[in-house]
From Swiss-Prot:
Name of the protein this chain belongs to: Small ribosomal subunit protein uS12
NCBIfam families: rpsL_bact
Ranges of Basic residues composition bias in the record: 124-140
Species this protein is from: Clostridioides difficile (strain 630) (Peptoclostridium difficile)
Similarity comment: family membership: Belongs to the universal ribosomal protein uS12 family.
Residue(s) carrying 3-methylthioaspartic acid: 102
Residue ranges, annotated region (Disordered): 1-28, 119-140
Subunit (UniProt): Part of the 30S ribosomal subunit. Contacts proteins S8 and S17. May interact with IF1 in the 30S initiation complex.
Record's keyword terms, sorted: Methylation, Ribonucleoprotein, Ribosomal protein, RNA-binding, rRNA-binding, tRNA-binding
Amino acid sequence: MPTINQLVRKSRKALEKKSTAPALQKGYNSLNKKVTDASAPQKRGVCTSVKTVTPRKPNSALRKVARVRLTNGIEVSAYIPGEGHNLQEHSVVLIRGGRVKDLPGVRYHILRGTLDTAGVDKRRQSRSKYGAKRPKEAKK
């Protein structure tokens, strides 16, 4: 515990807030081959592998995860939300930040319904989160 005199001489240092999605904070200048500080809400990338991962205790499932190499050169693991997907190696995807609580090391989500990722079909509720189109009205 510092004395008042020590605090007067040298004040406390504020804690630096760490980003939850650090790969979205970096850009890449391909002309100069340099990493830049260009923050973005989403980033495009190419799938290097698509696999299933088992979650931490106490949950049990086979969660769908893709390894994605982003346009800034960083490779990350991203979760594929929804039931069923059409992703495979070399698919071009858009990722956003947001971790999956029971999958260690997965800090990003893949956006459904954009680029090579198809939306979830037969989805009626929360359609915008899964890239599903509005269903056609049935004839009366």
